[in-house]
Regions:
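Extended, folded cores of ATP/NTP-driven motor/assembly subunits in large transport
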Residues: 2-19, 60-404, 448, 454, ...
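Short, well-ordered alpha-helix to beta-strand connector turns
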Residues: 460, 503-505, 523-525, 542-547
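Extended, compositionally biased accessory segments flanking or bridging domains
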Residues: 127-131, 377-482, 588-614
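Structural motif
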Residues: 145, 340-342, 442-446, 466-470, ...
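Substrate-engagement module of ASCE P-loop NTPases
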Residues: 162-166, 513-542, 554-555
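Conserved ATP-driven motor cores of ASCE-family P-loop NTPases powering translocation/secretion/packaging/pilus
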Residues: 477, 531-600
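N-terminal alpha-helical membrane-insertion module
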Residues: 1-104, 426, 546-549, 568, ...
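Conserved nucleotide-sensing/catalytic segment adjacent to the nucleotide-binding pocket
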Residues: 479-532
Length: 614
């Protein structure tokens, strides 16, 4: 397979106009048939009639040639016309299928949306990133509470069909895209298996929901008009979101969201194959859901959350709605799923699980063979053309009833690291790793810190321990075995690679009283300060922590915690009277209590450490 190197345009930041659209024009169809199919039959008939008129000898080559034309035009394979497969193959062979490494998302953006540029737009007093290309203009909103411990564990996200502004003669077409991206922590290490046993597979390592709002170019609409229309569309969408937490993304955050959704680490090239795309060290396959599931009245049977929990390294689900069609009675909608895995075997198993899940819901998906880069583009938060519009024929999304699209609402919030269970036997979790730096303080000793380290490894993290008591950590390190993502060293400056969603970084500081870290930190990097007890010297570091983990305290310690964390006197009493094995998770002046659950694997590691430490 020959590969062309990407040397084309990168993302522009100026005010230059976008070039003409590079996307294929929709093909005209009659009764579901392409015009090329009808022309092929006509050519075959003309060929046969001409051969008969010329003489019997001309029929010998004319008959197989005419038959080949008919078979090519009317033959079907794997649910598509052979002529469509031919067009897909020719387009696959004729385009660039490689994205070069880049320190930012510029090269990725240039490949996904040719001729695009990044600028900013002021919407309701907030400067947000705007992606402008030949299709139109787009802004991004991140949905969901991004706090380390959200106020609500679960909350529903509306379908883009319910958020789509009503059609109007004085507004350009609008398309919305809800992109869900999740890492299910499906590793094969002992730590990952232990954590799945603890959580029952209910919690994702991390998840992200991004809503893209796009206004499409229309005849007579100038750039300034599109900006005003986009501002109005975003205002209407935000009003419909109501109490759903959301924020507009600026330029840096938007580019980071784009790169993280693609899984492009910027250190290695991305290469498209026929059935899979190799990007960020993983293999990815995209699927277009062509027959949608029957809506289920029970939210527990919602399809989208179950898609996010497929046995893959990451899962991306894109649901688009719009523009309106048929006078506002239907709308174009597409559902695309992208799976990633470390090897082809695991990727095939994930694809089989996807098909089985959809079959149980009387739905069907088609793998985008020859269109894997189209699948990647469709699962980026750009609300651009989907695989149907980009592929052979350029047919665009299927027109569906708004109620059918609105039924695909999704519960959101089931991600994080599980610390234990509450009195209702429900998991208590918090987001140890986020797209921003996270600082934690744990009062209670090394054992709980080691449990957190094991569970962080299960989420894919690399753990760096800086300690003044190596004898407490070396038996733990030996118990994990060689090759474990753990390093134990003395306190001091250290250079570490930046964290990523799939490989976050946890720094554990077990060095007695320390000063609070006042640096801004980096995304996907969390710092856990471990203290055996709480004293006035810990006030600064505790007051600046995003989250505090408190085991039962002495009355004097509880008084310090209440003063620093802004807790009530009733909470102070609970902090000093809690039973052994309980842990309080403190965030934003609230305390959630959990029974510290441990697995057999974790108990084995901790017991070995305690025995060797005597």
């Amino acid at each position: 397979m020959t590969v062309d190197t990407v040397t084309g345009p990168t993302a522009r930041t100026g005010g230059e106009q976008a070039p003409p659209a590079a996307y294929p024009r929709p093909a005209r169809r009659f009764l579901g048939l392409g015009s090329g199919q009808i022309v092929a039959v006509q050519l075959a008939l003309v060929l046969l009639v001409g051969a008969m008129a010329a003489g019997v000898g001309y029929l010998l080559p004319a008959v197989p040639l005419a038959a080949a034309l008919v078979v090519l035009a009317w033959g079907r394979w794997r649910g598509r016309w052979l002529s469509e497969w031919t067009a897909v193959y020719l387009r696959y062979r004729g385009r660039r299928r490689r994205i070069e490494p880049s320190g930012d998302a510029a090269e990725l953006l240039a490949a996904a949306a040719p001729g695009s540029r990044l600028s900013t737009l002021d919407i309701e007093g907030v400067s947000c990133a705007t992606f402008t290309d030949a299709e139109g203009m787009c802004v991004l909103l991140e949905l969901g509470d991004q706090a380390v411990m959200p106020a609500r564990g679960w909350h529903p996200l509306p379908s883009p069909a319910t958020l789509l502004p009503a059609p109007g003669a004085d507004t350009p077409p609008v398309r919305l895209q809800l992109l869900l991206h999740a890492n299910a922590a499906n590793g094969s290490s002992p730590a990952a298996s232990s954590y799945r046993q603890l959580s029952g597979g209910r919690l994702l390592a991390n998840e992200r929901a991004v809503l893209a709002v796009r206004v499409q170019r229309a005849e007579g609409w100038q750039e300034a008009d599109l900006q005003r229309a986009l501002t109005g569309a975003v205002r209407k969408v935000r009003a419909k979101l109501g109490d759903v937490p959301h924020r507009l993304l600026g330029d840096v955050a938007a580019l980071r969201a784009l790169a993280e959704a693609a899984g492009h680490d910027g250190t290695s090239p991305a290469q498209e194959g026929w059935s899979a795309l190799h990007i960020g060290g993983l293999y990815a396959s995209s699927y277009a859901v062509e027959r949608w599931p029957t809506p289920h009245p029970d939210p527990a049977h919602a399809l989208l959350p179950r898609l996010l929990r497929l046995p893959a390294t990451t899962v991306s689900v894109s649901l688009t709605a719009g523009p309106w069609a048929d006078g506002g009675t239907t709308l174009q909608a597409e559902l695309t799923v992208r799976l990633t895995a470390p090897d082809h075997t695991s990727l095939g198993n994930a694809g089989t699980a996807l098909r089985q899940l959809l079959a149980n819901e009387h739905a069907h998906a088609r793998r985008l063979d020859g269109q894997q880069f189209d699948g990647l583009t469709a699962t980026l938060p750009l609300a651009g053309p989907g695989p149907a519009a980009l592929g052979a024929g350029g047919r665009g999304g299927v027109n569906r009833r708004p109620a059918a699209v609105a039924a695909l609402a999704t519960p959101y919030g089931g991600s994080g690291l599980m610390i234990g269970v509450n009195r209702h036997s429900e998991p208590v979790s918090f987001r140890l790793f986020r797209p921003e730096a996270t600082r934690l303080v744990m009062i209670g000793g090394v054992a709980v810190a080691q449990i957190l380290a094991v569970r962080a490894m299960a989420l894919g993290a690399y753990v760096l321990v800086q300690t003044t008591r190596p004898w407490a950590w070396e038996p733990f390190s030996r118990g994990l075995g060689s090759g474990a993502p753990l390093a134990v060293m003395a306190p001091g400056p250290v250079n570490v690679p930046p964290g990523t969603p799939l490989r976050p970084l946890l720094s554990i500081v077990d060095a007695g009283p320390v000063a609070a870290d006042r640096t801004p930190g980096t995304p996907w990097h969390s710092t856990l300060v471990v203290r055996d007890d709480l004293s006035p010297v810990d006030v600064d570091v505790l007051g600046r922590a995003d989250l505090a983990l408190l085991q039962p305290l002495q009355p004097a310690e509880a008084a310090v915690a209440v003063s620093v964390l802004g807790l009530s006197r009733d909470q102070e009493a609970w902090l000093s009277r809690a039973q052994p094995g309980m842990i309080g998770v403190v965030h934003r002046r609230s305390v959630r209590w959990a029974a510290l659950s441990t697995t057999g694997y974790e108990q084995q590691l901790i017991n070995a450490t305690q025995q060797n430490g005597r």
